[in-house]
Amino acid sequence: MAVVAAAAMLHPRAWTPVVSYGGELASSLTSSPVRVLMAAVILCAGAVAVLRRARRLRDVYLVDYGCFLGEPQHRVPTATATEHARLMPYLVDGESLDFMLRLHERSGIGEETSIPDSLRYMPPDRGVAASCAEAELVIFAAVDSALARAAPALPRGAADIDALVVACSFTTLAPEFADLVVNRYGLRADVRTVNLSGMGCSGALICVGLAKNLLQVAPPGTRALVVTTELLSSMFYPGTKREMLVPNVLFRMGAAAIVMSNSPERARFRIGHVVRTLTAARDRDYRCAFQVHVGEDPACINEGRRVFK
């Protein structure tokens, strides 16, 4: 029976209806230029739609976040800071102390901000070990909080992180902070890491923009962990120059971590536009926050008035 069916299919008359239908279609299209034009327009529109969808940047979402809130022993009310400074006249004179108090009153800094234990010593401990201890304290607390809050979107926990971006305003250590996070949480071997330092307070915004750019072109479901921090242990200035006393007053211990994704599933917010204006080409802006050495002491931050404009 199979041989008979095959022979019947090979018979010329068996293909006549198909050929006839194809010929009628071609004849119909050829005989009507309008139909040909419409078919071409439809095909072009479909091709353009497919290309635009393939090249369109993906939306990026904030899944959740966590912050270092500090423990009661890290809090430093104004009265405590003032008393501590008065006990170190060999580092801070009365005129400099009055200047810092006036600046503190105008800054709006609350009574529950924190400083590291290294700055409670007399004189303060500004060594590398103190900076490492502070980094581990604030970074791990922020990341723990972010991963715990984002747990519903991370079935495997930290193993679901595909990219890591870490920034610290001025302090640089070895190994870098990104490697510190990778080692602590056992991130995958193929995780993409970026470590930024020396970009000042804008480092946090730069991290978010960098992670957003990465997620916009990554496959769906990609997740990034962004961590930003500021370390005070190595930034304390023991002197009387007012422009260098500003960081002693304005900066406090802290860190923040956010989990970002290009999938809206379980996300809390959609990331909007990230805008950054770079004015480092102007000397005034370039030197608004400068790291300098004071004698044999470690590097301190010189912040002029331009940084507040």
What are these regions (language model features)?
Residues 1-57:
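Terminal signal-anchor or tail-anchor transmembrane helices
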Residues 16-23, 107, 112-114, 118, ...:
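Conserved catalytic cysteine-centered active-site region
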Residues 33-38, 164, 193-204, 248-251:
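Active-site nucleophile and cofactor-binding loops and adjacent substrate-binding regions
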Residues 50-51, 212-216, 244-249:
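A generic local secondary-structure boundary/capping motif
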Residues 54-85, 90-152, 156, 229-309:
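Hydrophobic pocket-lining "lid/loop/helix" segments that shape and contact the acyl-thioester
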Residues 142, 146, 163, 170-171, ...:
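Folded extracytoplasmic luminal domains of secretory or organellar precursors
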Residues 157-167:
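Short glycine-rich phosphate-binding loop at a beta-alpha junction
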Residues 166, 225-226:
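Structural beta-sheet core signal
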